Amino acid sequence: MAKKDYYEILGLDKGASDQDIKKAFRKLALKYHPDRNPNDKKAEEKFKEINEAYQVLTDPQKKAQYDQFGTTDFNGGGFQGGFGGFDFSDLGGFGDIFDSFFGGGFSSGRRKNGPERGSDLEYTLSLTFEEAVFGVEKEISVTRNERCETCNGTGAKKGSHPHTCDKCNGTGQVRHQRSTPLGNFVTMTTCDKCGGRGTIIKNPCEECRGKGIVRKHRKIKVKVPAGVDTGNIIPIRGQGEHGKNGGPSGDLYINLRVSPHSKFKRKGFDIYLDAHISFGKAALGTSLKVPSIDGDVKYEIPPGTQPGTVFRLKGKGVPKVDGRGRGDQYVNVIVDIPKNLNEKQKEALMMFMEASGEIQPRDVEKKSFIDKIFKNDSK
């Protein structure tokens, strides 16, 4: 199935503001609403489509997922394709526009006895550097709405059952016909007797007090793949709030936060590390044990290595989330210059400088001058 372009459906460019999204929806919803286009299947489908686009682009969590991945798979069960469950109340004066044409009821006319999807939940999960790099399984605790097991979600006391509302005949809505300058229109408003549920509970369940849902604490296992980083989100389908009236459950979104490491610094899938060596080893070369996320790695430092030289350890970085290889590790060489020299060290350096032609063969005055330099450096 081809992915839907929700911005294109609303006639907008990607990145449109919330205000532009609402304006576009108002215009299209008024044009394609089924009450203005009776028995027009194309108009009905178009209205469902723009309704779906609006639900995604005005939900921060869903919009962020859509903008990043271009997918419509947010809740595992798809969107409510119809328009009866849409709430126009957040459109400001738009509900009044519909009221003037269709006789009101659009802000409160949703059928409460129909299936309702549960709300999404968010959880922030803290990880150590190693857990993020190699992956881990964590158990978290969440509190959510769940179907009451005592009444099986009906809200009625055990041994009794909800009664069908005699005013709306169980539909949760009352039909009204009204004449307007545009013609006769039929609208549906929420039944004021049952509150839109379609049923009346005479003996409410004591456990849930007639709501059909209760708050529960649940332990949920979260599988964190190798290579994740701060800001990544792991969606767990169906682990959010339970739906009402047989509706699907919402989703649980795990926001990851990774603690920094004392030695390693991470950029993407690459790791950076500073390695300290003496100036003698930098000049002569040495075999160096370099810490890595897999353990120490032996690396040969060539003679004449300069401060700030960066060596690459290929494939020693962070595993990529998609499983396609690993990043690299970069080692920045820092040459430590001693601050305090003893007499033997000074003599050795003097001999080196003489041998390299940096200074003339020593005399007492020059030696005294050099000694003063080292003495000043040692302070």
Curated annotation (Swiss-Prot):
Where does this protein come from, organism-wise? Clostridium kluyveri (strain ATCC 8527 / DSM 555 / NBRC 12016 / NCIMB 10680 / K1)
* Cofactor descriptive note: Binds 2 Zn(2+) ions per monomer.
Q: Which InterPro entries match?
A: DnaJ, DnaJ_C, DnaJ_domain, DnaJ_domain_CS, HSP40/DnaJ_pept-bd, HSP_DnaJ_Cys-rich_dom, HSP_DnaJ_Cys-rich_dom_sf, J_dom_sf
Locate the residues binding Zn(2+) 1. Answer: C148, C151, C205, C208
Cofactor(s) recorded in Swiss-Prot or TrEMBL? Zn(2+)
Query: Which Gene3D superfamilies would you find in this protein's record?
Result: DnaJ domain, Heat shock protein DnaJ, cysteine-rich domain, Urease metallochaperone UreE, N-terminal domain
Q: What is known of its domains?
A: The J domain is necessary and sufficient to stimulate DnaK ATPase activity. Zinc center 1 plays an important role in the autonomous, DnaK-independent chaperone activity of DnaJ. Zinc center 2 is essential for interaction with DnaK and for DnaJ activity.
User: How does this chain assemble?
Assistant: Homodimer.
Keyword terms:
Chaperone, Cytoplasm, DNA replication, Metal-binding, Repeat, Stress response, Zinc, Zinc-finger
Cite the HAMAP family for this sequence. Answer: DnaJ (MF_01152)
Q: Name one GO biological process term.
A: chaperone cofactor-dependent protein refolding
Q: Which GO-annotated molecular functions does the record name?
A: ATP binding; heat shock protein binding; unfolded protein binding; zinc ion binding
Residues recorded as binding Zn(2+) 2, renumbered to this chain, are C165, C168, C191, C194
The organism's taxonomic lineage, starting at the top? Bacteria, Bacillati, Bacillota, Clostridia, Eubacteriales
The stretches annotated as zinc fingers (CR-type) lie at 135-217
Q: Give the range the annotation lists for the signal sequence.
A: none
Q: What does this protein do?
A: Participates actively in the response to hyperosmotic and heat shock by preventing the aggregation of stress-denatured proteins and by disaggregating proteins, also in an autonomous, DnaK-independent fashion. Unfolded proteins bind initially to DnaJ; upon interaction with the DnaJ-bound protein, DnaK hydrolyzes its bound ATP, resulting in the formation of a stable complex. GrpE releases ADP from DnaK; ATP binding to DnaK triggers the release of the substrate protein, thus completing the reaction cycle.
**Stretches forming CXXCXGXG motif repeats:** 148-155, 165-172, 191-198, 205-212
Query: Where in or outside the cell?
Result: Cytoplasm
Which protein are we looking at? Chaperone protein DnaJ
**CDD domains in alphabetical order:** DnaJ, DnaJ_C, DnaJ_zf
Q: Which SMART domains match?
A: DnaJ
